[in-house]
A protein has these predicted regions:
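Membrane-interface helix/loop caps of multi-pass membrane proteins
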Residues: 1-379, 656-658
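Extracellular/periplasmic envelope-modification machinery, especially enzymes
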Residues: 258, 323-330, 340-341, 348, ...
């Protein structure tokens, strides 16, 4: 058995410590997420070391035996946490979150969680969703995909070398060349994807492979002990190199944040730092990183780092539902302690017995059988639960349709005094939190069928842009411009347009108002901020150049936006100068807390008007711009169909109004259609 690298255990302890502290207290360590990059470098080094030794010894790699070892090492603990998460989701989580949780548990069992999150993260709205109980499995998915891909690449590289008739040393050389080639491609992809699609770039495997490669290439670098230098010089360089690695990691952890374009170039800091520690860290020198990592507590944390990583996130997600409030210092410390205790128990009773089984169980076939059984159980349970929830939601949708057909007292129509509806805020059988949580316009509405509204303006010709309603001979063409608060109005606006001979042209990009300028942001701009500025300028240019657009309706969420009312006035004046009428949409009232409407209603015992609230009179740059005395802009206001007197409502006409804390549910938004259209016509008078 090879000697255990104590410095690697220390590096693992550092990595898991960074991640856990970041998840518990992100404001204290804004870049702690780089801990996962350290894990990737370690994995690349260790796995490549093992595979290259096997190549040196046998001339090839036994894929079955390699994968069996990975199964025994990783899956028992992972499956344990997934089973726990499944049971906890069904018992503890609100019904509105169960479907997302069980679906992602199934994806995690298949080690596809990173691709699920990448798909969801295309839209910042998806990031607004409550994080699932197994969201952290994205990193394990990347690792497992690497473990599948890496040995296959090595086998192919060896086969190619032999076909080319190289000498006996060529297998090792072929592996090194393959690593370099794949690493370069992956790094370039990472840089490009981080600049062009940063949300999904964070999760997908191709943007992360180069981090494994950096670790793997260390296997082919001559050991520092073999470098031709005097012992004192070697020790001095080793000490400096090790602490440089620590410094790079700590700088990234301290100064990176959610606005740092990542991975891309920025990931070089923690990746190179981890590589330096792996290369120079194996040292007994006093006060070297390697010697410090020999302390028993650090070694223990390194030993249980995998299990601690698995357990800490479900505990973080479950805490507020168990204790009724978000955790602060003491709650965070309790999660930390429980994670360590569970990590110790998991290693002793699950990981170690699985890694070192009895002889009759130490077979490749047994490992694969265990994997298949675990995957089938978890995906089967996940799939069955998802199907049950979907069936329940279809039943709710049918009841809602029946309610709509049964009369005028449905959805927003109950707020119309002409309908004289009784009990407008009553909780009925159609008020279902689980249904509302999934009642999202991007999954049910027009936006689920196309992507043209989300593409850069310069990449979409005017004829190909999202156009709806009467596209051939419209009486009026209205351009809808803005962020996700424009997008949740697309379907009700188009429904009205179809019966009034309007054409609707959509310019939308979630998170961007179309009114930002470079000066609105701190410099330098992040990739997302630069995208907003460019998209806004392109949108304005196209709208002004088009003679077929009559009205431009801007709809945005003011919360968290940096756009100024002064610049909005300037933009609107320029658009008006090109012959268009400009309208500003008053934002829908937002919930007073981060709790979603489905969650609040599920937790409420009120059968009438649950979770109603008095809205805050927050500043709104759109309304400020519309009220400019020198250049006023008409306002489209539908708040009378969301609020009565000084109270706003989460249940109206048998429907839950929001699917989260600020976006209208698809079904309720559709019920607003006639009133949205009427409000636009009133603003045009």
């Amino acid at each position: 058995m090879r000697e255990k690298r104590l410095d690697i255990q220390g590096l693992r302890a550092l990595a898991v410590g960074l991640v856990v502290i970041y998840h518990l207290w992100p404001g204290r360590l804004s870049g702690g997420y780089i801990g996962v990059d350290i894990f990737f470098v370690i994995s690349g080094f260790l796995i490549t070391s093992h595979l290259v030794r096997e190549v040196d010894r046998t001339g090839t790699v036994s894929l079955g035996k390699f994968w069996a070892r990975r199964i025994r090492r990783l899956l028992p603990a992972a499956f344990t946490v997934l089973v726990f998460s499944l049971v906890a989701a069904l018992i503890i989580l609100p019904k509105s979150l169960v479907r997302q949780a069980v679906f992602e548990i199934g994806a995690s069992a298949l080690y596809l969680q990173n691709w699920v999150l990448a798909g969801n993260s295309v839209d910042y709205l998806a990031a607004d969703n409550k994080p699932s109980i197994v969201q952290h499995f994205w990193t394990l998915s990347v690792e497992e995909q690497f473990y599948i891909f890496w040995p296959v690449l090595i086998v192919v590289a060896i086969w190619v070398a032999r076909k080319l008739g190289r000498n006996a040393s060529s297998p090792r050389r072929a592996v090194a060349i393959a690593l370099v080639a794949v690493g370069i491609i992956s790094f370039l992809w990472s840089v490009y994807a981080t600049a062009t699609d940063p949300s999904s770039a964070y999760f997908i495997t191709p943007t992360r492979v180069w981090e494994f490669v950096i670790g793997g290439l260390l296997v082919f670098v001559r050991s520092w002990d073999q470098v031709t230098l005097g012992e004192r010089s070697r020790d001095r360089v080793r000490l400096i190199g090790g602490w440089m690695g620590v410094a790079l990691i700590l700088v990234a952890a301290a100064f990176f944040n959610e606005d740092t374009p990542f991975p891309g170039y920025a990931a070089l800091l923690p990746v190179v730092g981890a590589a330096l520690l792996l290369y120079f860290g194996r040292s007994d020198l006093a006060w070297s990183p390697g010697s410090i990592s020999r302390f028993a507590p650090i070694q223990v944390l390194g030993d249980i780092s995998y299990a601690v990583y698995l357990w800490h996130w479900p505990l973080i997600v479950l805490y507020p539902y168990v204790f009724g409030s978000d955790f602060v210092v003491l709650g965070g410390l309790a999660i930390l302690v429980v994670s360590v205790v569970l990590g110790l128990l998991t290693k002793k009773f699950i990981e170690d017995p699985a890694r070192y089984p009895r002889e009759r169980l130490n077979r490749t076939s047994v490992a694969f059988a265990f994997m298949m059984a675990g995957v089938l159980v978890l995906t089967g349970a996940s799939g069955a639960t998802t199907l049950k929830i979907d069936a329940d939601q279809r039943a709710v949708a049918l009841r809602a349709a029946a309610l709509q057909e049964g009369g005028s007292c449905y959805g927003a129509a109950v707020m119309d005094e002409a309908n004289d509806c009784e009990d407008p805020f009553l909780v009925t059988s159609t008020v279902d939190p689980a249904f509302a949580a999934d009642d999202r316009y991007w999954e049910k509405g027009i936006r689920s069928q196309d992507t043209c509204s989300r593409q850069p303006v310069t990449e979409v010709s005017p004829d190909a842009r999202c156009q709806y309603g009467d596209v051939d001979s419209p009486a009026m063409t209205i351009a809808l411009v803005g962020d996700s608060h424009a997008e949740h109005l697309i379907d009700p606006l188009v429904t009205y347009a179809e019966t009034h001979n309007w054409r609707v042209v959509v310019f939308s990009l979630s998170g961007c108002t179309g009114l930002e300028t470079t000066d609105d942001f701190e410099q330098p701009l992040s990739s997302g901020q630069a995208e907003c500025v460019a998209w806004g300028a392109e949108t304005q240019a196209e709208i002004m150049a088009r003679n077929d657009i009559d009205v431009v309706l801007y709809s945005n969420r003011p919360s968290g936006k940096v756009a100024s009312s002064e610049h909005a006035v300037d933009v609107w004046d320029e658009v008006r100068a090109s012959g268009k009428t400009v309208l500003a949409m008053r934002n829908v009232p937002e919930l007073p807390s981060n709790e979603t409407a489905p969650e609040c209603i599920e937790a409420s015992d009120d059968s009438y008007d649950p979770c109603a609230w008095t809205p805050d009179d927050d500043s709104d740059f759109m309304l400020d711009a519309a009220g400019d005395s020198s250049s006023p802009t008409p306002v489209v206001d539908i708040s009378d169909y969301l609020c009565s007197e000084d109270r706003c409502h989460m249940v109206i006409g048998g429907l839950i109004v929001y699917f989260d804390d600020n976006h209208l549910s698809y079904t309720f938004a559709q019920s607003l259609s006639p009133y949205l259209g009427a409000a636009i016509e009133k603003a045009l008078e």
